[in-house]
Amino acid sequence: MNESKSVASNELTSGKVERTTLKLSDKLKISSNIQQGNKFSLNKSITTVEVRKSKKRKNIDEAARSSLLLQNNDIDGNSEDKNSLTIQEQISRMNALQNASNNEKREELSSDSNKHIEEEVISVKAEVEQSVDVVLPNDNLLIESDSSEKVIVDPVTDSEHGDKDFQDVVMLDEFVSSNLDDAGDQKNGDQSDDISDLLEHKGIEGKKLKKYEKEHEEKKGNPKKVMSNNTYTKHVKLVIEEELEEDNNKQVIKNYRSKKNRVTNRSVKNKITRKVLIPNKITVQELANSMSERVKDVQQVLYQMTGKHDIKLTDYLDSDQASIIVEAFNHTFKLVDNAKLENDLYSDGNNMELIPRAPVVTVMGHVDHGKTSLLDAIRESNVVDGEFKGITQHIGAYQITLNGDKKITFIDTPGHEAFAAMRAHGTNVTDIVVLVVAADDGIMPQTIESINHVKAANVAMIVAVNKIDKHDADLDRITNALLQHGVVAESLGGDVIVVPVSAKEKINLDQLKSSILLIADLLELKAVYNTRASGTVIESKVDKNCGVVATLIVQKGTLKVGDIIVAGNQAYGRVRSMFNADGGSEKVAIPSMPIKVFGLNNVPNFGTSFIVVDSEKQARELINYRQDLLNVELSKQPAVDKSNILLYDMVDELNVILKCDVMGSIEAICYSIGKITHKDIRVNILYKGVGNITKSDVLLAETSNSIILAFNVKTDTQVKELAKQKNIEIKHYFVIYDIIDDIKKILTGMLKPLKQEVQIGTLSVRKVFSVGNNGSVLGCYVTSGLVKKGALVKLVRNNNIIHEGKIKVLRRFKDDVKEVTAGFECGILLDYSKEIYPESDVMNIFEIVEEIRVIQ
């Protein structure tokens, strides 16, 4: 820089300090009132040591004396040239004055202090490992070292050095500097050599030397004032701050690496070796969790094994792959075959003693043929009055006792079409089927369906012809109709027992009971009692007071209160209590006994199997295994055709939230809704569940624009108010038929009507009155049918339709009319501006007719 700014500070005799911003090229005028004896008061500052090569060493004392003499001459002078000095000259003279002052202090030092300094320097030298460039304060010293380089102390060179020159600088106090300089002037060359050797090392620490100086000052009784930090120049401060920041960053990095190494070493040292249980199938996520390892690490090992990049968390691994991965992470494993576990559970007790059990009888037939009434007559109960409109909506299980010790278990299934799946499940747990046929109605669709279920399940069947008391009852007609479906009665030479009964008049009920016991004896029904219990879920629901309630049929073993059961792939729990069909408490349940169980964590699906396990841990393992099997089956399903998805999205939807009292009702309603199909509209069941309507159901309906269908469940007042605020419709039903009928009506209202063109007449053009931009005015004759204002017109020329439009105006003479029939002339305004040929052009008249579509 040619020009730089600096601040010159002079301490006047009055004690005030005047500061002026000047340039290096400016001249300074020195006041003549300054006495010769006055010395410039300088703030002590830290100076830099610059290593320069020179041929000889300047005598510091002579330079100081000559500088002082020059200053005195300049101060005494009165001319303008003598009193005008540049800033650089003034700074040099101030340095000379300071050096002279330092020389006076050096002379005051005693030989004892020199000896002490020598001892201090020798002790520090022993600790120094590396040489360093040294900064000495306030003295222009030139100290020779063993090398060709010489150290020059210059207090004004801080602006001439770069950052690199300051990296190896050590700050020393002025007192140490003066003592070192004085020690260099001693005749004894040994001390000078020691100082020179000291300066060759870069390991001298300023703090240690400062400590030695402080101790020396305390011994002298004249402690030196410690320089304040504000005496540093701006450049030196900046360099020091940068160096401190860099050292701090290095220390932070060093601490971080040291901590990381400690953590790594500790983690490796304290890594736990786990024993991993490996089933037949396990996902990547599950394997990583069982090892407590990161998923990406497991994926990396899999990539090395298979070379596949697209490894998902839900991908399944077989036991061989999983075991290799476990060993790669230094864990141990144990193969667990959950399929074997389940097989062992169900095979337990196969070789035990078989004991006779009660028959399980399922009553099936068409709706309203008297199935529940017949059971009421047999049980001497009145269940049918509890059913809405006398139609059974739920599957029921009961047990009756005959002749003191003979027991029969009855399962009552709903008869209408919606419960086809329930009837199918009923045949899986039954031993004997009682097919109820009304004597007046005969064979109905659900009767035929029940016959097919019996044949598929290969179970014994008894036909009970009910309502035999009616005048139009015809038993022979019923037996002949059954023959057409492969059911041969004993009267016709077959093996199927046909019993005419009347539930209302209680006719032949004992004969029906005896027939059931006879077939049961022929079947020799037996089961193992002394083993873990297993069976089938007949029905399940949520009770607001007791929680989940499941109706079970025990098929094997003995179920006790306190047992842990697993039902299906989602429900398990400890049996808290059990009740029979009459509401009585039970402690144990033996084979063929229907029982209501409390204590499951979830609502199991009806028709699923249950089994008792040893612990809740084993129950969870079995649940997870069954869910994995389900996921594997779902993953094997073919990909959905994207073109079908686009078509599917174009279909209108009716969103439905379904809440029912029991799981069987949900399955029945979903089955019936699934049979409602149409190419332009469909029903989307967003959510289905067991229990009363809740606020969450209302909020979901609001979000999804759905209707809520409630079957045999209640809605409390708060939920009703919320639904009213949100304008959500809640429909309550007690018969499944009503739900299906309402859904069909709603879908019918959502369907857009079909528009069809129906030809209603024909016109022949007699005369063209005008043709313009506003249309053509034509004189026409109605040859057939009629013409209506606004009707669709198709202009035909040579059997080609050249124009389609509407009749804007229809007149008869000068009067506007709505229609003109055949055999009359009329005038029309047609929205067609091109040429029309009366001889060859014909106009066909059409009417748009909308056809209302109905969901059947």
Curated annotation (Swiss-Prot):
GO cellular component terms given for this protein: cytoplasm
Domain tr-type G, first and last residues per copy: 356-526
Region G1, residue ranges: 365-372
MF terms (GO), sorted A to Z: GTP binding; GTPase activity; translation initiation factor activity
Residues the record lists as binding GTP: 365-372, 412-416, 466-469
Main location: cytoplasm
CDD domains in UniProt: IF2_eIF5B, IF2_mtIF2_II, mtIF2_IVc
Domain of life: Bacteria
Name of the protein this chain belongs to: Translation initiation factor IF-2
The gene coding this protein: infB
